């Protein structure tokens, strides 16, 4: 079966496993965007550590869950978000100002909206988690 959106499938698997109170989830196939998105989630403590397994096919990622994640999702299509419109997107997607993160892909790499605001860069919106 052909996967249309690898990141969306990965985040849906994580969200479903979190709802079922699982401790680990297996994500396949592996992609660079998925790994960077998981790095942002791990940096903020929403997931535990993850391990990338190279099986010479598509690769696998084993993610340890810690029960802190409420919801995560992908925004499709990937809208352009200039710096001055970042507040509009965060207020639409997140439940409150101090809670959750919007993930962007920028010229400086994949980062959350707070880091993008500090670095004063805009980009395309990938997804969110809280």
Swiss-Prot record:
Species for this entry: Strongylocentrotus purpuratus
Annotated GO biological process: translation
GO molecular function: structural constituent of ribosome
SUPFAM superfamilies: Ribosomal protein S8
Disulfide bonds listed in the record: none
Recorded family membership: Belongs to the universal ribosomal protein uS8 family.
Swiss-Prot/TrEMBL keywords: Ribonucleoprotein, Ribosomal protein
GO cellular component annotations of the record: cytosolic small ribosomal subunit
Residue stretches in coiled coil: none
Protein name as it appears in the record: Small ribosomal subunit protein uS8
